[in-house]
UniProtKB/Swiss-Prot annotation:
Protein name: Urease accessory protein UreD
Gene that specifies this protein: ureD
One Pfam family recorded for the sequence: UreD
InterPro entries given in the database record: UreD
UniProt similarity note: Belongs to the UreD family.
Amino acid sequence: MSDFSGSGWLAEIFLRYELKRGVTRLTDKQHIGPLMVQRPFYPEQGIAHTYLLHPPGGVVGGDKLLINIDVQPHAHALLTTPGATKFYRSAGGVARQVQTLTVAPNGFLEWLPQENIFFPEAQVRLETHVRIASSSKFISWEIQCLGRPVLNEQFDNGDIRGRLQFYIDDKLTLAESIFIEGSQKQSAVMREFPMVGSLYIYPASDELKAELHESLAVFFSTEVRPLEYGLTDVDGILVLRLLGSQTEPMMACFAHIWQATRQYWLGYCPEPPRIWAT
């Protein structure tokens, strides 16, 4: 675990999942501060579902969250959060969240948190480091919400900087960054939308991509709320990008694609975690 000194608090968690007698078990758990998990449960055969509990009071300037997930060979873990992570107005310090997601050969990690909400005047740095093997399976998403659109609250005078690094067999395969300052959601990145989401799926294939294009067509044939999307294959990683104004349709779209991917890979359609409906 890390040493930290600063004006805010440190919250850190390390979780390791291993396959034991055909069932994925949480075999190592270490935490500091208000980041913790509930005991894994098993709505699906052998797959460990885990709720990561974020600080209930939200995150402010000076706070630091460190999340480390380690999935061992042939283990299969799904993690989500019971609600949004809220980054509040900063009095001068920067809030930081660093996620390190590691998947061993033939492991499977599904990292499916609910959205991040950035309040006006928040100062936030986000880092996600993904390290997987070429034989791993990986699904992850992130949804960033600037301000609170449902209250007509815009993101003003804040500073959000995010970085993603995706390694396959120790080779940097995908690197992305986002920089939003003040009301720059009107930039080319956001196209006037207050929310952006990214879904990452590995491994990609032409057949899976075609299946997901069909699934997106089905979803958007009934979805009337404004969303824009694009699906691309980046060096073997499928990336689905969404722009929108409401959490519910974005989560619904990602969940729909997650189910389609699971159907393609494992031969059945999983039920969404119940916590998403609360």
